Amino acid sequence: MMRLDFQRKLLSHTERVKAVDFHPTEPWVIASHYNGQVGIWNYNTQTLVRSFDINDVPIRACAFIARKNWFVCGSDDFQVRVYNYNTGEKVTQFEAHPDYIRALVVHPTQPFLLTSSDDMTIKCFNWDMSWKCVQTFEGHSRYVMSLAINPKDTNTFASSCLDGTVKVWSFGSSVANFTLQAHDRGVNYVNYYPAGDKPYLITAGDDNLIKVWDYQTKACVRILEGHTNNVSFAFFHSKFPIIISGSEDGTVKIWHTLSYSLIKSYNFSLDRAWCIAQNKDNGLVTVGFDNGLITFSLGRDEPSVTMDSSGKVVWSNYNEVMSAMIRPAKEQSDLTDGSLISLSVKELGTTELYPAVLKHSPNGRFVSVCGNGEYIVYTALAWRNKAYGKALDFAWSADSNVYGSRTSDRSIVIHKNFKESNRLDLSYSCDKIFGGFLLGVVGSDFICFYDWDTGILVRKIDVKPKGVYWNDDGRFVILACDDDFYLLGFNAEMFYSAVESGTADEEEGVADSFEALADVSESVVNGKWVAETFIYTTTAARLNYLIGDQTYKIANVESSFYLLGYIPRDDRIYLTDRDMNVVSYSFNLAIIEYQSLVLKGDLEAAQGLLEQISETDRPRLSDFLSRLGYKEAALELSGDSVQRFELALDAQRLDIASQIAQELDDPLKWRSLGDAALNAWDFVLAQECFEKGKDYGSLVLLYTATNNHEGLKELSQLTKSTKINNTAFICSWLTNQPAECVNILTSTQRYPEANLFAATYCPDEVKNVLPEWKVDLTKNQKERIADSLGDLELKN
């Protein structure tokens, strides 16, 4: 049975929804309502972006025309209306039919709008020709309920009608290519199968049935029964092998396209289901009901793709399996970090089940396919079936001849050389299994690790990881949980010794076999080990690596990209999205080896690797050394002047910092160096730095502390000439120049302070300052205050 991962993105309680559509690039859903309104919703923020009051009659059809920034809607007043969804301006309005408009479809490449109506016709309008009706399709005998353009041949389309038929048409011909007598009652919906392997149509009718048709042979392939009222729609999902149907019985049902069995039935308590739309890029689905709309996803976000160490990429498109070989980096002259890589794709074969998970064996010779409750192991080169069986989950051991399959919640079968070698019957219910050096079995809130050969419990750990990643030699393992991940060290000798001595606990395992080494507060999307370095992508859209207990950023990436792996031949990391857009980033393994040796304290051996590391990468290593406290080594390695200056300060190499400051000639750098020199009691260097950095406040402190009377006098004159009056005043005061202090206060029109200071410290200056104060008061119309001051000169 296929497992669904239902995640609700948007739920809105609204008036009856009659039509929905996705914007191809924005996170928007448009919905038209029975009350004559149209709303655009953002399913990421769950907010209404814009609302349009179109009219007061039902609007049964709407769609985005994204390449024109428009949306179009058709209603029961026979009108088609077109609006600019950015400005809210109505672009045009015209009568398309003499009766209710039931459906409309926008052609994916041509400037065509198809409409269908209760007048039993279909019309094609060309917006480049001022919305001229360029063709009318006649032949149905009742209301035409839905339209669908063939994604594999956009010159043809299908229509469904309440006369019980489905007709397939071609643009340019007014006569239907053929007619299917699809249902005993009205046909509400028609939809094309999106993949290239099957020429199928699906129909939904008022006889409560869903039917799958081969439009080449005109034969009914399968009838799906389960709804108890009129079926409003049945829809092939573009990403997963499922059919989604909705009915006036209020349910939305999910069916498997391979077995045609019912997987799941949902009732969202929104009454009758009327309409559906799908985002072809991300697989999101929106369904409209009597009482609102809901947007949701059903499958895993990760693409079904795997890559071996040579660069061979294998992925699936439904049950078709494709492959491509990534060309060596030296053959790609335009290769840059983050740029798209051109792939030469070929069809590798098909698989008998839908591959939810594809995984290369460690040696790259085999590829496992797991899905629909089964697994198949294929040879990687010829794509021949090597083994198969039941499996809810599949996991490879570090030994490519050993693998495990979870056949039920309490049973795991281990195979060796493609034959069953052991079986674990668990005392608890398990959710998932992981491969690697040990077999990881996830319970309700813990994970148990078992030895592949003996099935003995190695250790029970009280965390529930969503991902388990072993390095190649089995000494380290990452447990990736929802919000953080843990680095553990594994001591195999400790485990085997405990087993031999009989001290292994049957319920907890060997406590000392694992050691916690690091706890990192980041959410891992997926990851790979390269030697002793863990490379991973995060939910924050970053590509990072962990070495020791320190994390470092490689690049920011799109959130939709997933890690494929590292190719040593290219020294590059490769990532892909669901549409197999592959990008890469440089990752020099010599850098990692250098960092690993430094973490072990072997700086001498690390120095021997520097020849393999480019000058552009060395500043990053310099940062790494600095963070570990190796300031001198970081200084020697760095070639960036700004970085070297900071490192020289940290290493207290003031001579080197002084040379760099001379080169940079930045006042801020001089001031920083001056502070460092002051802390080192190097007053000569400090004075030079503060002078060149024009740090006059620090110079006052330095001259005062060293009793440099002449320095203060010179500083007083310098700051006075540059109008730094506070410093000039302090320097004049400290050098016992009260008259100069009065002069500074007067020049800045601080007359009250000047008179008070003069009267206190140099009375002879009052006769010069007081008249200026009085003149200033009079100028500001304060004659009474000026007259009341009296003759302070006489009093003194």
Swiss-Prot record:
Q: Which SUPFAM superfamilies match?
A: WD40 repeat-like (SSF50978)
Which membrane topology term applies here? Peripheral membrane protein
Q: WD repeats span which residues? A: 4-42, 46-84, 88-126, 131-170, 172-214, 218-256
Matching entries from Gene3D superfamilies are given as: 1.25.40.470, YVTN repeat-like/Quinoprotein amine dehydrogenase
Q: Which InterPro entries match?
A: Beta-prop_COPA/B_2nd, Coatomer_complex_subunit, COPB2, G-protein_beta_WD-40_rep, TPR_COPA_B, WD40/YVTN_repeat-like_dom_sf, WD40_repeat_dom_sf, WD40_rpt
Keyword Chloroplast applies: no
Q: Which GO terms describe its cellular component?
A: COPI vesicle coat; cytosol; Golgi membrane; nucleus
Subcellular location per UniProt equals: Cytoplasm; Golgi apparatus membrane; Cytoplasmic vesicle, COPI-coated vesicle membrane
- Name the keywords, alphabetized: Cytoplasm, Cytoplasmic vesicle, ER-Golgi transport, Golgi apparatus, Membrane, Protein transport, Repeat, Transport, WD repeat
- GO MF term set: structural molecule activity
**Its Gene Ontology biological processes?**
endoplasmic reticulum to Golgi vesicle-mediated transport; intra-Golgi vesicle-mediated transport; intracellular protein transport; late endosome to vacuole transport via multivesicular body sorting pathway; retrograde vesicle-mediated transport, Golgi to endoplasmic reticulum
Q: What is the recorded function of this protein according to its Swiss-Prot or TrEMBL entry?
A: The coatomer is a cytosolic protein complex that binds to dilysine motifs and reversibly associates with Golgi non-clathrin-coated vesicles, which further mediate biosynthetic protein transport from the ER, via the Golgi up to the trans Golgi network. Coatomer complex is required for budding from Golgi membranes, and is essential for the retrograde Golgi-to-ER transport of dilysine-tagged proteins.
The family this protein is said to belong to: Belongs to the WD repeat COPB2 family.
Q: How does it assemble?
A: Oligomeric complex that consists of at least the alpha, beta, beta', gamma, delta, epsilon and zeta subunits.
Provide the protein name.
Probable coatomer subunit beta'
